[in-house]
Swiss-Prot record:
The lineage of its organism: Eukaryota, Metazoa, Chordata, Craniata, Vertebrata. PANTHER family: RIBONUCLEASE P PROTEIN SUBUNIT P21 (PTHR14742:SF0), RIBONUCLEASE P SUBUNIT P21 (PTHR14742). This is Ribonuclease P protein subunit p21. RNase P consists of a catalytic RNA moiety and about 10 protein subunits; POP1, POP4, POP5, POP7, RPP14, RPP21, RPP25, RPP30, RPP38 and RPP40. Within the RNase P complex, POP1, POP7 and RPP25 form the 'finger' subcomplex, POP5, RPP14, RPP40 and homodimeric RPP30 form the 'palm' subcomplex, and RPP21, POP4 and RPP38 form the 'wrist' subcomplex. All subunits of the RNase P complex interact with the catalytic RNA. Keywords: Acetylation, Metal-binding, Nucleus, RNA-binding, tRNA processing, Zinc. It comes from Homo sapiens (Human).
Length: 154
């Protein structure tokens, strides 16, 4: 289990604003302006406090107008094929900005990979310091000093 989270209150506030935007759209789909305001506020708080948001949250917010992207309500989702790869294209219905996401079932986001987790990093063995190969003259043994001085006199 991870230790105490820095800026816990800020993350709770971001979570509340994100959930409030979802609730507003679920209750009244016509009230997109209030949901957009909640998402914009969440985005500005995260920027001001330099907090990293989860990629799944970032994918559901429009980067242009800060609208909550709900397929069929505030955005359209299309499956496209380009150069043999399949892409999901989300287009915001408010500002017409589109985002493309690669459809790769084997793709894992960095945060979902095992090496990104703090617990697995703590379990790995600690790094050993490298031996210092560059010795100064003062680090040499007295016999070595005598040998070098004797060879220089010859």
């Amino acid at each position: 289990m991870a230790g105490p989270v820095k800026d816990r209150e800020a993350f709770q506030r971001l979570n509340f604003l994100y959930q409030a935007a979802h609730c507003v759209l679920a209750q009244d789909p016509e009230n997109q302006a209030l949901a957009r305001f909640y998402c914009y506020t969440e985005r500005t708080i995260a920027k001001r406090l330099v907090l990293r948001r989860d990629p799944s949250v970032k994918r559901t917010l429009c980067r242009g107008c800060s609208s909550l992207l709900v397929p069929g309500l505030t955005c359209t989702q299309r499956q496209r094929r380009c150069r043999g790869q399949r892409w999901t294209v989300q287009t915001c219905l408010t500002c017409q900005r589109s985002q493309r996401f690669l459809n790769d079932p084997g793709h894992l986001l960095w945060g979902d990979r095992p090496e990104a987790q703090l617990g697995s990093q703590a379990d790995s063995k600690p790094l050993q310091p490298l031996p210092n190969t560059a010795h100064s003259i003062s680090d040499r043994l007295p016999e070595e000093k005598m040998q070098t001085q004797g060879s220089s006199n010859q």
